[in-house]
Amino acid sequence: MQPYLDLMRQLLEHGTVKSDRTGTGTRSLFGHQMRFDLSKGFPLVTTKKLHLKSIIHELLWFLKGETNIAYLKDNGVRIWDEWATEDGELGPVYGRQWRAWPTPDGRHIDQISQVVEQIRTRPDSRRLIVSAWNVAELPDEGISPKDNARAGRMALAPCHTFFQFYVADGRLSCQLYQRSADVFLGVPFNIASYALLTLMVAQVTDLEPGDFVHTFGDVHLYSNHVEQAKEQLSREPYPLPKMHLNPEVKSLFDFRYEDFTLEGYQAHPHIKAPVAI
């Protein structure tokens, strides 16, 4: 995970001090890219322990097309609680856009099913893309996330905005464009989530995993995460673990939490840090 640590160090040393929506303040860079060869291990940060259960359940929740946090809460995942309404609604966030993008004529497009079929039938297509950036349903920046959700808009604008698959030599790669990235808390989750999605899609399309490429717009370190970042950078990373998927699963939507086994994950202790709301 050296590319991730190098990015955090670069933010500490060269980041531009900026204000932000939350009022916390950040050190920010614009335009950065990391690449992880998924054949060399699963890119899960080892310089602090991550809650893999949350990462897996959130991804499965996205793939279900759900936008209510009930499934997450039922499985002990609280990462979306701060932005949901009293009824657990978040508005048309990732799952809705991935699985049921609304069209002007009242239909809905299942982008995930569509892209899996395209990978199988047209692997050389340059349109193997899934987007969560639906301009018509973005939140009003003048009101709170909960009020946006109550009004039928997204509680939060998508941070991981769109992703593209690429097939070459029997290997499936994925590139994510992330417009906004919280490097200390969010990015380790995002890396693992999209790496896992790539493994899953590769399995159901009979391909080998290739690279996960992570491209950033505004990548930032919040001012109240600086000391935590320094502590993390003082630690020596461990070798990457391996992720095993149940080989019996043939449909992307049939994966369950029990179908994932992480082998050899050795990590330094968790580092607490506040979430910028």
Curated annotation (Swiss-Prot):
(6R)-5,10-methylene-5,6,7,8-tetrahydrofolate binds at residues 51, 182, 276. GO terms for biological process: dTMP biosynthetic process; dTTP biosynthetic process; methylation. The gene is thyA. DUMP binds at residues 21, 126-127, 179-182, 190, 220-222. Its EC number is 2.1.1.45. One of its GO terms (cellular component) is cytosol. It is an enzyme of class 2 (transferase). Catalyzes the reductive methylation of 2'-deoxyuridine-5'-monophosphate (dUMP) to 2'-deoxythymidine-5'-monophosphate (dTMP) while utilizing 5,10-methylenetetrahydrofolate (mTHF) as the methyl donor and reductant in the reaction, yielding dihydrofolate (DHF) as a by-product. This enzymatic reaction provides an intracellular de novo source of dTMP, an essential precursor for DNA biosynthesis. This is Thymidylate synthase. It comes from Thioalkalivibrio sulfidiphilus (strain HL-EbGR7).
